[in-house]
Regions:
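Short, charged N-terminal beta->alpha structural module
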Residues: 44-72
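Short N-terminal binding/cap micro-motifs at the start of the first secondary-structure element
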Residues: 13-20
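Radical SAM [4Fe-4S] cluster-binding motif and immediate context
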Residues: 205-259
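Glycine-rich beta-alpha loop elements in corrinoid/cobalamin-binding modules
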Residues: 61, 77-207
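Cofactor-binding loop segments of dinucleotide-utilizing enzymes, especially the Rossmann-like FAD-
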Residues: 9-10, 149
Length: 259
């Protein structure tokens, strides 16, 4: 099957950290006392995939975007970074999410200051995206959309937006807006360079899609937002929404059934 929308990220994101989430924190630092290959194997090993490169688990946030697109009737799937090249001929867009694109968030930035070295997550992402760009040089119509918790970081590196051919940066909860962007891509319409999802435009509880396939290590969310409303925090500025027990049960049953 051909997919119009390939959702992906680098190896530090598409991994289950040997079924130990806390090993994932090693990707926020540079390799210390060990060769980088061993450090990466410990913190971000390759994950099992099917014959077309779909990982058996994927980050929960990417699963939500995948589910939103699938529920809306779009041809979308998450693909392991090592298999993206197999889908470039049919894809209309590559959609990328990340927790810390350029090691500007904690604890990556602290490790960077302490060691004066680039953390593994930022290094892996740079190599990952450079590899993609080199493979799509002749595919001028292929769009690249970036988002996720670290989308704000692109605002601090505007030169890289042009270097890496980024068409749209989506900052905020993306389930609603990603469907609009996907339709624009299929229609051949112009895309906005940057979208800031206002808290008032965040999806309501009944607009949040339930994941279709397992998340990394079975992690799910049971609520969004925060009642505090702190101005300095992107989470607390969003409306609070508690998942119903039925929603939680459905996602847990899916993960158990497909494990």
């Amino acid at each position: 099957m051909n997919y119009d929308f390939i959702i992906t990220s680098d190896r530090t994101m598409i991994t289950n950290h040997h079924n130990n989430e806390f090993l994932g924190f090693m990707t926020t630092a540079p390799a210390i006392g060990l060769p980088e290959l061993i450090w990466k194997w410990i913190s971000a090993p390759k994950i099992k995939v099917d014959k077309i490169g779909r990982p058996i688990q994927a980050p929960y946030g990417l699963r939500k975007i995948e589910a939103a697109l699938l529920d809306a009737g779009f041809k979308a799937t998450i693909i392991d970074p090592d298999y993206i090249h197999k889908h470039l001929d049919s894809a209309k867009a590559i959609m990328i999410g990340h927790h810390d694109y350029f090691a500007l968030a904690s604890p990556s930035c602290e490790w960077k200051m302490l060691t004066n070295k680039e953390p593994i997550n930022a290094k892996c992402f740079r190599k990952f995206l450079t590899k993609i760009i080199n493979k799509i040089k002749d595919k001028k119509d292929l769009k690249i959309i970036v988002g996720g918790p670290a989308a704000w970081q692109w605002l601090y590196v505007p030169k890289l937006i042009k270097k890496y051919r980024i068409n749209t940066v989506i900052n905020g909860e993306g389930e609603k807006v990603i469907k609009i962007i996907a339709q624009k891509i299929l229609n051949g319409e112009a895309l906005p360079n940057y979208i800031e999802v206002d808290p008032s435009d965040s999806p309501k509880l009944n607009e949040i899609a339930l994941i279709r396939y397992p998340s990394i290590n079975g992690l799910i969310e049971i609520m969004r937002g925060c009642p505090r409303g702190c101005k300095f925090c992107s989470v607390t500025s969003r409306p609070i929404r508690f998942y119903t027990l039925e929603m939680i049960e459905k996602e847990l049953k899916l993960i158990i059934h497909m494990a």
